[in-house]
């Protein structure tokens, strides 16, 4: 599994490089595309989830949650830091995993709470 993590991180970095056009990290560009830069009091409620083996959880998702809370924007966090399951990026679609099923249920609850017109 650790080799899978390195492969996933490599893929994500290549994806970012495809958008930035650089072979190195362009911190200013990456900062400019972060949703953190665009938070306002009118920002809608957010549901955010990340896997315990997804490096974007610690580098993007958790800082985003902190910024949302600082702005008092409603945020529903779905993280499993102590899970024994190997939860990679997009674990939410691996429905054989217990965490995925729980996240799906929390997603439905979030939609029911903030978008009641759908139900």
Language model features with spans:
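Alpha/beta-hydrolase superfamily serine-hydrolase fold, recognizing
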Residues: 1-119
């Amino acid at each position: 599994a650790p080799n899978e993590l390195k492969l996933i991180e490599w893929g994500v970095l290549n994806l970012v490089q495809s958008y930035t056009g650089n072979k190195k990290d362009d911190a200013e560009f990456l900062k400019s595309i972060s949703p953190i830069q665009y938070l306002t009091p009118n920002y809608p409620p957010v549901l955010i989830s990340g896997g315990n083996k997804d490096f974007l959880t610690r580098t993007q998702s958790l800082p985003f949650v902190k910024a949302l809370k600082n702005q008092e924007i409603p945020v529903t966090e779905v993280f499993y830091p102590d899970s024994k399951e190997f939860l990679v990026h997009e674990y939410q679609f691996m429905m054989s995993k217990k965490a995925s099923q729980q996240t799906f249920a929390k997603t439905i609850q979030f939609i029911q709470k903030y978008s009641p017109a759908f139900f």
